[in-house]
């Protein structure tokens, strides 16, 4: 069983709805679950708890990520603790991949988080941090967190996604990136791999 969990502020583009419908029509044992709210880390925690209650793996899909059935199948096929698809930021001129080779949190001596971008992609590679826009997390990972904490609570100046990755790595889980496909990050313009300038 896989829960497709979508945190949303209230609306989802039809292209994303179409992506999810395509999976529901062509694959079995899939449950969509949508949570509306302005605090994304609370929405993600509600989705995580829903997946745990249903003894399911969890595929986070952000409400601005368009994906194909092939992309869905590739994540499932990887059969690993945590695996993300590759997508890129959607700000003009700053559209780096939303995955980082290293992620160092803010500390007393380090005033802000430090991230090291990926400069060379391998088809399948271990990373320290990914955005959760298209990320499959196995149920045993979800179950490893106490009910009393929100694993998405921002840590220092890291966002909820990288804070979650940090906690997962502290629990001994690897975070993998499947770069054999890319996703569309929707806005007024669909940013994807062809827009990436390689850190220039």
Predicted features and spans:
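N-proximal low-complexity "stem/linker" segments adjacent to membrane-targeting elements
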Residues: 1-42
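Residue-level recognition of beta-strand->loop/alpha-helix junctions
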Residues: 34-36, 86, 179
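Active-site nucleotide-sugar/metal-binding loop of Leloir-type enzymes
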Residues: 45-57
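Conserved catalytic core of nucleotide-sugar-dependent glycosyltransferases
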Residues: 48, 68-153
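Short beta-strand-to-loop acidic/aromatic patch adjacent to the donor-nucleotide binding site
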Residues: 54-66
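Short, high-confidence coil segments that cap the C-terminus of an alpha-helix
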Residues: 55-56, 80, 173
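C-terminal catalytic/acceptor-binding lobe
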Residues: 144-200
